[in-house]
Amino acid sequence: MSQIQDLKDENVEMDIDPQEQNEKKPLLLDELTKFTILHPYNYDSHIKLIEELKRLDKKKELSEARKTFQSIFPLSEDLWVDYLLDECKNCRTLDDYVRIKTLFDLAVQDYLSIKIWCMYLEFTLNLMDTSSFEQEQSELNGVITLTDAHSLFERAYQTCKFHFSKSQCVWTLYLEFLQTFGDALFEGEEEQEIVFKNKIYDFHIDRLKLPHEQIEETFTSLSTFVTNNWSPSEYEDVMVKSNKVYETTLKRNAKIFNKELLLNSANHSLEAYMDLINDESRRSTAELQYITTLYERAIVLYPLIPELWLQYTAWLSKVDFSSSQASSVAERATRNCSWIGRIWSIKLTYMTLSGASTSAVCEEKDRCLNSNLLVNFDEVIDFFSGFLKACLYLSSNEDKPQEFLKHQIHKVEDYLRKNHKGSKDARMRIELSKIYLYSEISDFESVEKCWSDMFHDFQNQALYWISRYISTMKYNPELAAETLKKSLYKNVDQPQLLFQFYQSIMDLNNDCFTNTSHLYDVLNAQRISFKRQLDSFAEETKQTVENTEPLKVPQADDTAALSKKRKPGQEGDVFKKSKPIEQHRNREELTVLVTNLPSDISENELKIFFKDCGNIIRIFILEDNQKDVKVAQIEFSETSEVLAAKTRDLKSIRGHEISVQIHVDTNLYVTNFPPTYDELDITKLFSAYGNVVDVRFPSLRYNTNRRFCYVQMRKPDEAHNALQLHKKLLEEKYPIQVFISDPLRRTPRSGAVYEGRELYVTNIDFKVNEKDVETFFRDYGQVESVRIPKRFNQHKGFGYVVMTTNQDAENALSAAGKQLGNRVLNVVLSKPRESLEKTRVSSNDNRTLAKSFETTESNKMSTPKKSFEQIKSKSLGVTNVDGTVNEARLRSLFESYGKLYRVVLHPEHEGAVVEFLDIHDAGKASLALEGHEIGGRLLHITTVNEMMHNVPSSMNHSDYNTSATRPRRLGSRTFQGFNSNHSNINSKKDDLDDKEMQIDAPKSNDDFRKMFLK
């Protein structure tokens, strides 16, 4: 089957094998040529064709293919450079020069490319140097006049001079041109030498007036020029005047330089460009050409971003730019983003304003539609909406403007009926444009017909009724008021917006008595609307309950079975109280955002305002971008309370009309950041993308290895903006992961352990390394990774092997019992670590100090055995440790006072054990870190004994075994891991005498310090 038959879709990617045999190449070239003819708007096919022609060195066909490509699509900077370099090599005749000059003119129109401008200027300088011409280039002698060259250099400089970082190379080429051809350029003028000297001086001064990165080089060049061309007596006066210009520009230059540094640090991201553009646009002394250059610089990097082109073309309409210049930008916008209807409509608008004829505008409209570039219905609507508005201006050129407008409306309706039958525009753009045109020609009967036709589809939209009122007020105020009154009782999407609009209209147009009578309608409609919302919520709740699997009711046989006498030990199974289901806070759906609040609003005032809505869990009051107002985030406990809070939308607080919206998509789930990061580090990281409201770390009580947090941003757009951090490398080893938090999208845990691909291998020979283990297990399948934990450069005798598939892992289980090195391996599948919640011990099974310091057998074999007193003397007990503080943060804090042996968290005691290698380091740390704040708490340094006795104030005792327990007798040795029967004590612990095994009575801080400082 031929390749061309597989390329039916316009958007298909043409993956063509470059290693195809030579005899098939002509066939491939023919198919590419045919395909580009059949599908001229397929970008990739043009690229493939050009690459193939270039490989085959078909220069003539290559030039034609590039010409066709450029006529349809704007070429990128790299494509233009490649194109122009090839063409410049073959500049031999006058026709070649005309063709290449035309290409350069087209290239500099597409994008503001300093590289292409420099190529253009160097090409011109080379042609003016006839001494380097070959014999066959004789036609090129004098092809460029001095005046034409001067005009070109001036155009290049004026176009590029506001490019802060790269415009200097254009200026330098221009200066070289003036210095080389200045004598001939100013020949014949009186006092030619003085004119030339002043021209070069003014050229430097003009450059110094503009901020640019190489401003010091420019000033140095000026100083050298003045030294060489002015007498010593004149030098000082000239340089004093020049220095004033230089010093004035330096102040502006420093500000822009700092902004350019931020741009570089952001890797020239689109967001950084837009921030810089918006910042410059707000300045009262804004330089319009500098802002234009910023837009052009952004477009070079992001030519296919529609929002960038839309903002650029819209900005041109607000500033003092000619319609022809704006029309040129719009033309380029359609070439880059030809699938965006709004951009096409803006182009037609600028064509109309620049004086284009009706036929020219209509031809451009038809060209857009016939090319099938607007495939999305929404884009077609945007296009026609703008076109109909432009028709109002075009009708002024017609003999019968009303008939022209109606004809264009009917053509649009016919097109939509034929190509998009059944599609509806929820934003009513075409309908509103039609109503606007009918109103302008005073055809109010057609206006009413439009509103009536829209009623069926849009009667539930508040925007429909508000727009209808505004439109009808122009020709029938009484009908408008009556229509708006009826809309109050409609079940619309934004009832509060409609109520507030109605009240505002009544306040503007009626006296106090009439206003009072209308108040009844508003209050009654609000009551009905609120009842609708509650009924809707109740129905949704009912459906949720019905879809939930019902609880199983015990049958008669089951009841009888329960009534029988049970065996001892079965009571717990039958009568154990069921643990209540833990209710998770769904902050994403239970928080509302309140904006436009008074700047001095208080939390108590907000509680009073929303008290009737429900139970408020917490309130955050934040600064807004506008300094005179604030915003607040209010979290409720139930969905119905959020709906009730929504009824406060558009209400007033001390003269401020507030907005209340459900606050979704503001919480971010963040993981895989450096273990030492705390709330301040996370806040600093995310503050670059918006205002951070809150950072919440999880409790480590049941899993000390958790490393994630939730970051709440002020607004949804700020949260989405922060997604740019996703996969950014922190500290050169941690690719952070950032997601919009969505509890409804929680997925089951995944990974090697959960997929049954990880093996737990024990009894590994201490002389064996990870490479040996990997080689050993390759006999059973493909090995993904091997990890053998180490301490002090010696592994512990166990490790983890991850296979590529679970089948390979099953095969590798047969390695159990086989010898590696001098030991026989034990191999089992790794199991997910159960949370401490499931393995929690009873409250009477108190952990002991000896148990806290118990080491594994592998540790005993790899490190010298230490006495219990030695371990205890170098260990600190740390209490009041917040449940969100992990081991890495504690280690980072304590290791600044000396080398650590280990850090062990004890979340059940809100504490930790920190063991140093040196007793003096432990003493220094105990004195220095007493009362140190971490995680919002002040640490208390004590003994390990006291820490292990610590009962957190926040502990819920009902979570533990609630059976009655006897107070422990002083001197008793019955504790976790040991029995009163001495024969059951592990023989390996015989070296610990009874005194060492006993938990000491709690010591005071003074006793503890004396132990270290004696």
Curated annotation (Swiss-Prot):
Residues 953-965, 973-986 have a biased composition (Polar residues). InterPro entries: Euk_RNA-bind_prot (IPR050502), HAT (IPR003107), LSM_interact (IPR008669), Nucleotide-bd_a/b_plait_sf (IPR012677), Prp24_RRM1 (IPR034397), Prp24_RRM2 (IPR034398), RBD_domain_sf (IPR035979), RRM_dom (IPR000504). Residues 1-11, 568-580, 987-1006 have a biased composition (Basic and acidic residues). SMART domains: HAT, RRM. SUPFAM superfamilies: RNA-binding domain, RBD (SSF54928), TPR-like (SSF48452). Pfam families: Lsm_interact, RRM_1, RRM_occluded, Suf. Keywords: mRNA processing, mRNA splicing, Nucleus, Repeat, RNA-binding. One of its GO terms (cellular component) is nuclear speck. Residues 590-667, 666-743, 757-832, 874-946 form the RRM domain. Residues 1-21, 556-580, 953-1006 are annotated as: Disordered. The keyword RNA-binding applies. It is found in: Nucleus. GO terms for biological process: mRNA splicing, via spliceosome; spliceosomal complex assembly; spliceosomal tri-snRNP complex assembly. HAT repeats lie at residues 57-89, 95-126, 148-180, 286-318, 442-474. GO terms for molecular function: RNA binding; snRNA binding. Functions as a recycling factor of the spliceosome, a machinery that forms on each precursor-messenger RNA (pre-mRNA) and catalyzes the removal of introns. Chaperones the re-annealing of U4 and U6 snRNAs (small nuclear RNAs) released from previous rounds of splicing, an initial step in reforming the U4/U6-U5 tri-snRNP (small nuclear ribonucleoprotein) that can reassemble into another spliceosome complex; this step involves binding U6 and facilitating the unwinding of the U6 internal stem loop, followed by base-pairing of U6 to U4. This is U4/U6 snRNA-associated-splicing factor prp24. The gene is prp24.
